[in-house]
Curated annotation (Swiss-Prot):
GO terms for biological process: female gonad development. Pfam families: DUF4715. It comes from Homo sapiens. PANTHER family: COILED-COIL DOMAIN-CONTAINING PROTEIN 182. Residues 46-109 form a coiled coil. The gene is CCDC182. This is Coiled-coil domain-containing protein 182. Keywords: Coiled coil.
C-alpha cells in the first residue's frame, strides 16, 4: 500500500534577527500580532489544502490502525483466557492423575507387605503339609503291613 503522502522538506526562510526584534518589540509593547511578513512563510492555499487532506488521511489511517490493534488485543486476550482455562483443566487433570498414582503406589506397598508376610507362611504351610502327608503315608503303610501281617497269621 502506498502512503498517502510523500515525505519532503518544506523550506522556510527565517530571519532570526527580525524574529528576535519582533519578540522584543512585542514583549515591550504587549503586541503579539504577527507582522506583515509572516504570511509569506506559509505555503500557498492550494498546497495547504493538499497537506490538510494528507493529514486527514493519515489521521484516518491512524484511527483504523488503532481499531485493528484493539481488535487484535481483544483477540489475544480471548485466546489467552482460553489457553489459561485449558491450562487450569490440564493442571486439575494432572493433579487427579498424581493422586491416582499415589493411591496405586500405596496399594502396591500394601500388596508387597502382604506378600512379604504371606510367602514365608506359605512355605511353612507347604512344609507342614508335606510332613503330614509323609506321616499319613507312613501310617498308611504301617496299617497296611499290620493288616497283611494279621491276615497272614
Amino acid at each position: 500500500m502506498e502512503p498517502l503522502y510523500q515525505a519532503g522538506s518544506i523550506l522556510m526562510t527565517v530571519n532570526t534577527l527580525q524574529g528576535k526584534k519582533m519578540i522584543e518589540s512585542g514583549l515591550q509593547s504587549g503586541d503579539f500580532s504577527l507582522s506583515q511578513s509572516w504570511p509569506s512563510c506559509l505555503p500557498p492555499p492550494a498546497d495547504l489544502e493538499i497537506l490538510q487532506q494528507k493529514v486527514a488521511g493519515v489521521q484516518r489511517e491512524l484511527e483504523d490502525f488503532k481499531k485493528e490493534a484493539l481488535k487484535s488485543i481483544h483477540y489475544l486476550e480471548d485466546a489467552f483466557c482460553e489457553m489459561n482455562g485449558a491450562l487450569v483443566q490440564q493442571e486439575e487433570q494432572a493433579a487427579r492423575v498424581r493422586q491416582r498414582l499415589r493411591e496405586e503406589e500405596d496399594r502396591g506397598i500394601v500388596r508387597n507387605k502382604v506378600l512379604t508376610f504371606l510367602l514365608p507362611r506359605e512355605k511353612q504351610l507347604r512344609e507342614h503339609c508335606k510332613r503330614l502327608e509323609d506321616l499319613l503315608l507312613d501310617r498308611g503303610r504301617d496299617a497296611l503291613r499290620a493288616t497283611k501281617k494279621s491276615q497272614a497269621d
